């Protein structure tokens, strides 16, 4: 076994926070979503104690789809909660954030260039890469695969 003298580090993965408009009850069949905002605030506090070097959010930051009128407001609320995380946060979109894959059985509206731009306005790029302690991390946007959108090809360049 090689003698590697690189110090170990930890990072955090969070997903499906489903932040909802303040004071609005959700109509989803899953009652657990009614506590989404309270739950992510607790996660933010727990992350401060865990002290990861960075956080990766795997998507579904917000509950409303980008086609809904309250999407921008809820994205701003989400960012106000996430700014309590004192470490770099790398965001990846989920179907609630940019729309669903182009398949008939998908529950959300299909991903589109308009939805991608709305997401980027709040959370930045939908794919990318970063380095930490000599490790190269690559983040991809799976929702655009087989979509025919230009971003599908762009992320592979």
Feature map (PLM): residue ranges:
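Extended active-site neighborhood of metal-dependent phosphoesterases/phosphodiesterases
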Residues: 2-3, 30, 66-156
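N-terminal active-site segment of His-dependent metallophosphoesterases
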Residues: 1-68
């Amino acid at each position: 076994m090689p003698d590697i003298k690189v110090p170990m580090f930890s990072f955090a993965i969070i997903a499906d926070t489903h932040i909802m408009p303040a004071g609005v009850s959700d109509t989803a069949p899953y009652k657990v979503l009614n506590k989404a905002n309270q739950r992510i605030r607790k996660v933010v506090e727990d992350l401060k104690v865990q002290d990861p070097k960075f956080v990766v959010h795997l998507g579904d930051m917000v509950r409303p789809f980008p086609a809904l009128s309250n999407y921008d407001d809820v994205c701003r609320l989400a960012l106000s909660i996430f700014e309590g995380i004192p470490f770099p946060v790398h965001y990846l979109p989920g179907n609630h954030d940019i729309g669903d894959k182009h398949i008939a059985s998908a529950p959300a509206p299909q991903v589109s260039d308009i939805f991608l731009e709305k997401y980027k306005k709040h959370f930045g790029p939908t794919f990318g890469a970063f380095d930490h302690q000599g490790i190269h991390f690559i983040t991809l946007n799976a929702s655009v695969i087989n979509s025919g959108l230009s971003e599908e090809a762009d992320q592979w360049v």
